[in-house]
């Protein structure tokens, strides 16, 4: 009599793993204003005029797969409205969060927000050019990254790393994909 119950339990666990194995959602905080507080774009969607096209497109490139979507919130020029942007993100299901740029005090606010979300059971992680002091903070510390002769600072490249991780299935080692996608130059 116990076997059907075990079989059902295995099916439930397998479905849970399958659900988690697919592509993920990127959260992107931009230092800009826009007519809407939040914008959701899937791979292939047109980036509206007035939105940082480069950051959004980099977040949607993905890895082995493309991310499910990118949820963009606007934090005002110079991140003056970062608190409101983070509050807007609270109701969204995001897996990897990135800033495009930074301002004084903003990285710590994002780190604190991510920790709060984790305490509430959400599985969000942040990719930042900021010292990682928590398992949910991924420190992208490469000062400059060059892609197709375009040079990016670490802050500018964090959306790309978020998209890469969001598009990497759990069956694949993320570091392996990273080295396949990028050439790392050391001085």
Enumerate the predicted regions with their spans:
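An N-terminal, globular interaction/scaffold subdomain
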Residues: 29-98
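A short linear-motif detector with a strong N-terminal bias
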Residues: 3-10, 47-52, 75-78, 103-107
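Generic cytosolic/nucleocytoplasmic N-terminal low-complexity/intrinsically disordered segments
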Residues: 23, 45, 52, 67, ...
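A glycine- and small-residue-enriched flexible loop/hinge signal that marks low-structured segments
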Residues: 29-32, 39, 84-187
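Intrinsic disorder/low-complexity signature
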Residues: 16, 49-51, 136, 145
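Short, intrinsically disordered N-terminal pre-domain segments
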Residues: 1-26
């Amino acid at each position: 009599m116990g076997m059907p119950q075990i079989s059902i339990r295995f099916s439930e666990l397998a479905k849970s793993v399958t659900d988690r194995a697919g592509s993920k959602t990127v959260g992107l905080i931009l230092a800009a204003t826009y007519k809407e507080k939040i914008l959701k774009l899937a791979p292939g969607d047109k980036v509206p005029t007035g939105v940082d096209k480069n950051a959004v497109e980099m977040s949607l490139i993905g890895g082995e797969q493309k991310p499910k979507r990118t949820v963009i919130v606007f934090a005002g020029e110079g991140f003056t409205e970062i608190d409101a942007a983070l509050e807007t993100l609270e109701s969204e299901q995001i897996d990897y969060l990135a800033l495009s740029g930074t301002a004084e005090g903003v990285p710590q606010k994002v780190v604190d927000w991510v920790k709060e979300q984790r305490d509430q059971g959400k599985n969000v992680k942040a990719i930042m050019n900021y010292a990682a002091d928590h398992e949910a903070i991924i420190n992208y510390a490469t000062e400059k990254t060059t892609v197709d002769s375009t040079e990016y600072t670490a802050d500018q490249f964090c959306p790309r790393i978020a998209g890469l991780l969001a598009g990497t299935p759990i069956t694949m080692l993320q570091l392996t994909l990273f080295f396949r996608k990028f050439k790392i130059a050391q001085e």
